[in-house]
């Protein structure tokens, strides 16, 4: 496990796309007007992060960072709705923090079973049966499913422990965790043996708490030297700190007092999240380890008075000989109990059932200028959740669907706001502000029942209805009269040439009357 511990990873999550609605008409013998029967599309699956007690690392997400939920199924005829896509549940360790690509805190997952919907799936499109109304009895179109949300998530694990053991490498922190609990971390006689945080559960009387063995710190850890920045964040959740000092250190330039000052300096330089207690202000205990070595006992007697001046209790212990551990465990239990008692009691959440807002009802129309100084152009941009969602649901290959979109925008008040912003017929209008924005030339909507008179799948408002000018009308009238005179001359020439019969002449006389 020590070589495969991963506590930071970037996940590319993609929610499932919603299924398209179905545009179909009921067909049955002796029922010529069966009506629309297209079903709705299914909802896309969500990508969900869930705390799993059996998961202790983000290794699986590092190996497979791209996670996509299944899409919703398409609607079908006979009022058959498409099936929803299954949710993709990803297990993460307890204490996982979820941030956006910009660094915004999205979720802090603490406690088994805690869930966070990381990438919601798209909603399914409505079938033509759901779109039928008194004016549009048999829609020849259906709405498309919405695409699922796609985003990058930065996951970070911060160890959940009550007490953190900090100190220089080879100070005996792992041995101390193994002696206090049933944990079996890797222990060796060389520095930086511990490369991952090790957790152990300690029982002192009626108090049960967890202890974390943080990898060794060195001067400059808060600036990234050694393994400092990678594992100092695992100390953030601890309510108390235990300084483990090496009493049997053989280096001439180090002693327990200088080691304590160096570690305190690094803890003070480390910046915690907003609202958290700084590391240097948290309760602490000082432990001189390796008391089984004669030189360590002598060193403890020399520096004990200087260490007690720091304002923290000092314990001389031996993780190998198991001496002084009982007193140390009860001292740590007192700090944990005091911290737990100081926490405010959790107020039971009152469950209130109320309608959930679908989305933001508002929108905004802005005037934009673009281009160089010599060729300045103007366009109008419509921003809002509803217009953007409606555009995503529209099948622009179907004229009737485009007309339905125009009606929805007009009822929402978009056209009125475009007029107020100075838009004129033919102006460039953009809906949305992302890569899926739609650009079109705006024409005011006609409400004279065009959606009723048009054929299925068409909209008369999208056809060419340009009115001729006065000169064009005069020219058309002259051409009509000239064509009429030409036709009469041709008929007269045929009659004089003897091509007409008596019956033809009788018909001509009747037409003249």
From Swiss-Prot:
<feature type="binding site">
    <location>
        <begin position="289"/>
        <end position="292"/>
    </location>
    <ligand>
        <name>GTP</name>
    </ligand>
</feature>
<dbReference type="Pfam" id="PF01926">
    <property type="entry name" value="MMR_HSR1"/>
</dbReference>
<dbReference type="GO" id="GO:0005737">
    <property type="term" value="C:cytoplasm"/>
</dbReference>
<feature type="binding site">
    <location>
        <begin position="192"/>
        <end position="196"/>
    </location>
    <ligand>
        <name>GTP</name>
    </ligand>
</feature>
<protein>
    <recommendedName>
        <fullName>GTPase Obg</fullName>
        <ecNumber>3.6.5.-</ecNumber>
    </recommendedName>
</protein>
<dbReference type="InterPro" id="IPR006169">
    <property type="entry name" value="GTP1_OBG_dom"/>
</dbReference>
<dbReference type="InterPro" id="IPR014100">
    <property type="entry name" value="GTP-bd_Obg/CgtA"/>
</dbReference>
<dbReference type="InterPro" id="IPR015349">
    <property type="entry name" value="OCT_dom"/>
</dbReference>
<dbReference type="InterPro" id="IPR006074">
    <property type="entry name" value="GTP1-OBG_CS"/>
</dbReference>
<comment type="function">
    <text>An essential GTPase which binds GTP, GDP and possibly (p)ppGpp with moderate affinity, with high nucleotide exchange rates and a fairly low GTP hydrolysis rate. Plays a role in control of the cell cycle, stress response, ribosome biogenesis and in those bacteria that undergo differentiation, in morphogenesis control.</text>
</comment>
<dbReference type="InterPro" id="IPR036726">
    <property type="entry name" value="GTP1_OBG_dom_sf"/>
</dbReference>
<feature type="binding site">
    <location>
        <position position="174"/>
    </location>
    <ligand>
        <name>Mg(2+)</name>
    </ligand>
</feature>
<dbReference type="InterPro" id="IPR031167">
    <property type="entry name" value="G_OBG"/>
</dbReference>
<keyword id="KW-0963">Cytoplasm</keyword>
<dbReference type="InterPro" id="IPR006073">
    <property type="entry name" value="GTP-bd"/>
</dbReference>
<feature type="domain" description="OCT">
    <location>
        <begin position="355"/>
        <end position="444"/>
    </location>
</feature>
<keyword id="KW-0479">Metal-binding</keyword>
<keyword id="KW-0460">Magnesium</keyword>
<keyword id="KW-0378">Hydrolase</keyword>
<feature type="domain" description="Obg">
    <location>
        <begin position="3"/>
        <end position="160"/>
    </location>
</feature>
<dbReference type="GO" id="GO:0005525">
    <property type="term" value="F:GTP binding"/>
</dbReference>
<keyword id="KW-0547">Nucleotide-binding</keyword>
<comment type="subunit">
    <text>Monomer.</text>
</comment>
<feature type="compositionally biased region" description="Acidic residues">
    <location>
        <begin position="504"/>
        <end position="513"/>
    </location>
</feature>
<dbReference type="GO" id="GO:0042254">
    <property type="term" value="P:ribosome biogenesis"/>
</dbReference>
<dbReference type="Pfam" id="PF09269">
    <property type="entry name" value="DUF1967"/>
</dbReference>
<feature type="binding site">
    <location>
        <position position="194"/>
    </location>
    <ligand>
        <name>Mg(2+)</name>
    </ligand>
</feature>
<feature type="compositionally biased region" description="Basic and acidic residues">
    <location>
        <begin position="458"/>
        <end position="497"/>
    </location>
</feature>
<dbReference type="InterPro" id="IPR027417">
    <property type="entry name" value="P-loop_NTPase"/>
</dbReference>
<dbReference type="GO" id="GO:0000287">
    <property type="term" value="F:magnesium ion binding"/>
</dbReference>
<feature type="binding site">
    <location>
        <begin position="318"/>
        <end position="320"/>
    </location>
    <ligand>
        <name>GTP</name>
    </ligand>
</feature>
<feature type="binding site">
    <location>
        <begin position="213"/>
        <end position="216"/>
    </location>
    <ligand>
        <name>GTP</name>
    </ligand>
</feature>
<dbReference type="InterPro" id="IPR036346">
    <property type="entry name" value="GTP-bd_prot_GTP1/OBG_C_sf"/>
</dbReference>
<dbReference type="InterPro" id="IPR045086">
    <property type="entry name" value="OBG_GTPase"/>
</dbReference>
<comment type="similarity">
    <text>Belongs to the TRAFAC class OBG-HflX-like GTPase superfamily. OBG GTPase family.</text>
</comment>
<dbReference type="GO" id="GO:0003924">
    <property type="term" value="F:GTPase activity"/>
</dbReference>
<feature type="domain" description="OBG-type G">
    <location>
        <begin position="161"/>
        <end position="337"/>
    </location>
</feature>
<keyword id="KW-0342">GTP-binding</keyword>
<feature type="region of interest" description="Disordered">
    <location>
        <begin position="457"/>
        <end position="513"/>
    </location>
</feature>
<feature type="binding site">
    <location>
        <begin position="167"/>
        <end position="174"/>
    </location>
    <ligand>
        <name>GTP</name>
    </ligand>
</feature>
<dbReference type="Pfam" id="PF01018">
    <property type="entry name" value="GTP1_OBG"/>
</dbReference>
């Amino acid at each position: 496990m020590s070589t495969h511990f991963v506590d930071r990873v970037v996940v590319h999550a993609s929610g499932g796309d919603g299924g398209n609605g179905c545009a179909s008409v009921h067909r049955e013998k002796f029922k010529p007007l069966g009506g629309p029967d297209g079903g709705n599309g299914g909802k896309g699956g969500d990508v969900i992060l869930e705390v799993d007690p059996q998961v202790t690392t983000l290794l699986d997400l590092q190996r497979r960072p791209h996670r996509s939920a299944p899409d919703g199924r398409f609607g079908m005829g006979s009022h058959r709705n498409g099936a929803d896509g299954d949710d993709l549940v990803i297990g993460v360790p307890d204490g996982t923090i979820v941030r956006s690509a910009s660094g915004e805190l999205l979720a802090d997952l603490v406690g088994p079973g805690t869930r966070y919907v990381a990438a919601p799936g798209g909603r399914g499109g409505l079938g033509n049966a759901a779109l039928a109304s008194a004016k549009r009895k048999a829609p020849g179109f259906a709405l498309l499913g919405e695409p699922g949300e796609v985003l990058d998530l930065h996951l970070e694990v911060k160890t959940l422990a009550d007490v953190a053991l900090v100190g220089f490498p080879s100070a005996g922190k792992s041995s101390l965790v193994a002696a206090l609990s049933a944990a079996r971390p890797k222990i060796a006689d060389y520095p930086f043996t511990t490369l991952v945080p090790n957790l152990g559960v300690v029982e002192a009387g009626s108090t049960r708490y967890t202890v974390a063995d943080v990898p060794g710190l060195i001067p400059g850890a808060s600036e990234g030297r050694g393994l400092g920045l990678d594992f100092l964040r695992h100390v953030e959740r601890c309510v108390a700190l235990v300084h483990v000092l090496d009493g049997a250190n053989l280096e001439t330039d180090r002693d327990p007092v200088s080691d304590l000052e160096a570690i305190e300096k690094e803890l003070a330089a480390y910046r915690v999240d907003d609202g958290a207690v700084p590391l240097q202000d948290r309760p602490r205990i000082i432990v001189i380890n390796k008391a089984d070595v004669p030189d360590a006992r002598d060193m403890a007697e020399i520096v004990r008075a200087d260490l007690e001046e720091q304002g923290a209790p000092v314990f001389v212990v031996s993780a190998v000989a198991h001496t002084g551990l009982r007193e140390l465990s009860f001292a740590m239990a007192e700090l944990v109990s005091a911290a737990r008692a100081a926490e405010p009691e959790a107020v039971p959440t009152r469950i209130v059932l109320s309608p959930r807002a679908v989305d933001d009802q508002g929108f905004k129309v802005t005037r934009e200028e673009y281009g160089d100084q010599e060729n300045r152009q103007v366009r109008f941009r419509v921003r809002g959740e509803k217009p953007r969602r409606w555009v995503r649901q529209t099948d622009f290959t179907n004229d009737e669907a485009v007309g339905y979109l125009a009606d929805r925008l007009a009822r929402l008040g978009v056209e009125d706001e475009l007029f107020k912003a100075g838009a004129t017929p033919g102006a460039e209008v953009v809906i949305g502000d992302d890569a899926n924005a739609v650009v079109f030339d705006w024409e005011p909507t006609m409400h004279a029942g065009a959606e009723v008179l048009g054929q299925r799948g068409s909209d008369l408002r999208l056809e060419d209805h340009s009115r001729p000018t006065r000169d064009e009308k005069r020219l058309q009238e002259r051409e009509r009269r000239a064509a009429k005179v030409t036709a009469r001359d041709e008929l007269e020439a045929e009659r004089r040439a003897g091509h007409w019969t008596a019956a033809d002449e009788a018909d001509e006389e009747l037409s003249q009357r």
